[in-house]
């Protein structure tokens, strides 16, 4: 099956084909903050340009 939000992934196609209320689609992304980036990628709703 597909992977939902915050689930570990390797590519965009791993993520479920769903949108949030803002119309953002799930993409396989690396979460980063001031401390650096996670070692793995997760399915997250991406609001950037397609």
Swiss-Prot record:
It is found in: Secreted; Nematocyst. GO terms for biological process: envenomation resulting in negative regulation of voltage-gated potassium channel activity in another organism. One of its GO terms (cellular component) is nematocyst. The keyword Disulfide bond applies. It comes from the Eukaryota. Contains 4 disulfide bonds. Negative results: has no activity on voltage-gated potassium channels rKv1.4/KCNA4, rKv1.5/KCNA5, rKv2.1/KCNB1, rKv3.1/KCNC1, rKv4.1/KCND1, rKv4.3/KCND3 channels, hERG/KCNH2, voltage-gated sodium channels rNav1.2/SCN2A, rNav1.4/SCN4A, and cockroach BgNav1.1. Belongs to the sea anemone type 5 potassium channel toxin family. This is Kappa-actitoxin-Bcs4a. It comes from Bunodosoma caissarum.
């Amino acid at each position: 099956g597909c992977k939902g939000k915050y689930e570990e992934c390797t590519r965009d196609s791993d993520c479920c084909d769903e949108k949030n209320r803002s119309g953002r689609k799930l993409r396989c992304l690396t979460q980063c903050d001031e401390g650096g980036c996670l070692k793995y990628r997760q399915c997250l709703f991406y609001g950037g340009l397609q």
